[in-house]
């Protein structure tokens, strides 16, 4: 399959964010790294904001593909247990710097936050306390090494995943959608 120029530019942009941070992603840096003129970049991304929207959209698609591969299908076709297991599997490894920076920045912009909410919401159930605990463990594993002086050892990661499986085993194996009427506080046991 032939990769189009826009996809190559997004991959280059992601590598800039990974190595130098989000603030370093400019038309100048992307032009220098890709060999494409600034006017060529503006053709694909008329504004830096549009570049960030496209970069987050691409990252969210990648994330969704990883979740679907781990779950064995799209969120709408698998059980809550499979969805949460996939989330745990995908997030049990430390985030890349680029993913973490995009995630943090997304919360500062409603349009970009909506991209991630649309991608991730089908995979979680904020009304199921066991699913919330699994998500908290998965999210914690994903960011831990970036916010603590000492990274987790492989044994510590495995212990956290094992603990999450206790809560995973309490989730239904029947394909289901989140129930907005569930009472979070009364369901944790």
Write out the residue ranges for each language-model feature:
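Solvent-exposed, amphipathic alpha-helical segments
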Residues: 12-19, 66-69, 137-144
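Helix-turn-helix
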Residues: 8, 16, 22-50
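Generic hydrophobic, amphipathic alpha-helix propensity
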Residues: 5-16, 30, 55-59, 63
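Hydrophobic alpha-helical connector segments
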Residues: 54, 61-97
């Amino acid at each position: 399959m032939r990769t189009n120029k826009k996809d190559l530019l997004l991959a280059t942009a992601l590598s800039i964010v990974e190595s130098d941070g989000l603030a370093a992603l400019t038309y100048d840096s992307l032009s220098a790294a890709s060999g494409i003129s600034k006017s060529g970049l503006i053709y694909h991304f008329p504004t830096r904001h549009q570049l960030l929207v496209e970069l987050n959209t691409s990252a969210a698609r990648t994330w969704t593909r990883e979740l679907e591969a781990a779950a064995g299908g799209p969120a709408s076709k698998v059980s809550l247990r499979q969805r949460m297991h996939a989330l745990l599997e995908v997030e049990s490894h430390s985030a890349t710097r680029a993913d973490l920076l995009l995630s943090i920045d997304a919360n500062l912009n409603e349009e970009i936050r909506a991209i991630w909410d649309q991608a991730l919401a089908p995979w979680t159930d904020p009304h199921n306390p066991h699913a919330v605990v699994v998500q908290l463990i998965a999210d914690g594993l994903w960011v831990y090494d970036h916010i603590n002086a000492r990274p987790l050892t492989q044994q510590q990661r495995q212990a956290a995943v094992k603990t999450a499986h206790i809560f995973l085993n309490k989730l239904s194996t029947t394909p289901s959608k989140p129930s907005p009427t569930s009472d979070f506080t009364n369901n944790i046991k």
